[in-house]
Amino acid sequence: ASPPEVNCSQYNRKGSGIACSKQLKPICGIDHKTYSNECMFCLLNQNKQFQIRKLYDDKCQIECTNYSAICTMEYFPLCGSDGKVYSNKCSFCNEVVKRRGTLFLAKYGQCK
């Protein structure tokens, strides 16, 4: 089953664009970016050429159950919720385990 669509029209206000609350109710987009709530998801994607869809409710996360404790030198950067860039999934997952699950994926690629 595909994830439910986000109805962005409910956040549009006539003449003023989108005004979002600071409510924290994270969603993960199909672009693997975590958005703080549906309204911010709509605001940040309103001018994109292609439609970003919601993947699921909650912060985006990487599956870390089958990671190796010894990592390769492969470079596929991941930005952690701590603002730090991890060189690949393996190094990110090692840090997730070390921090007992308090680290989340902010996005694929560099943080800035």
UniProtKB/Swiss-Prot annotation:
In this chain, the site described as Reactive bond 1 for trypsin is at K22, Q23
Q: Where is this site: Reactive bond 2 for elastase?
A: M73, E74
Read off the SMART domains from this record.
Answer: KAZAL
- The primary site where this protein sits is secreted
InterPro entries, A to Z: Bifunctional_prot_inhibitor, Kazal_dom, Kazal_dom_sf, Prot_inh_Kazal-m
All residue ranges annotated as the Kazal-like domain in the record: 2-62, 63-112
Q: Which SUPFAM superfamilies match?
A: Kazal-type serine protease inhibitors
**What cystine pairs are annotated?**
C8-C42, C20-C39, C28-C60, C64-C93, C71-C90, C79-C111
Function text: This inhibitor is composed of two homologous actively inhibiting halves: one which inhibits trypsin, the other which inhibits elastase.
Q: What's the name of the protein? A: Double-headed protease inhibitor, submandibular gland
* Organism (species): Panthera leo
Q: What is the lineage of its organism?
A: Eukaryota, Metazoa, Chordata, Craniata, Vertebrata
